[in-house]
């Protein structure tokens, strides 16, 4: 079964182009994005959501995504993307980049 997370990732057109190029080279990353919901409001920007995903650092596709975000951060391009991961445990929330720049935020609620 494994530990599951919900993950949102949004980016500028520049970062989307990089992702599309890397997907052409790497079938694991391409499959990761094919499994995501594409929520982009326009064709240029990137906006994806993975629900109930195994977001393990040991998986090759996740390693590529993590490396891409690290490169963007080290290049001071952290405002070119935003990522939020919410794990199963209440306090397991991870953010990278600048999610607020893409109107991304965490909202926990109970519907009865």
Regions found by a protein language model. Give the residues of each.
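Charged interaction segments
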Residues: 21-112
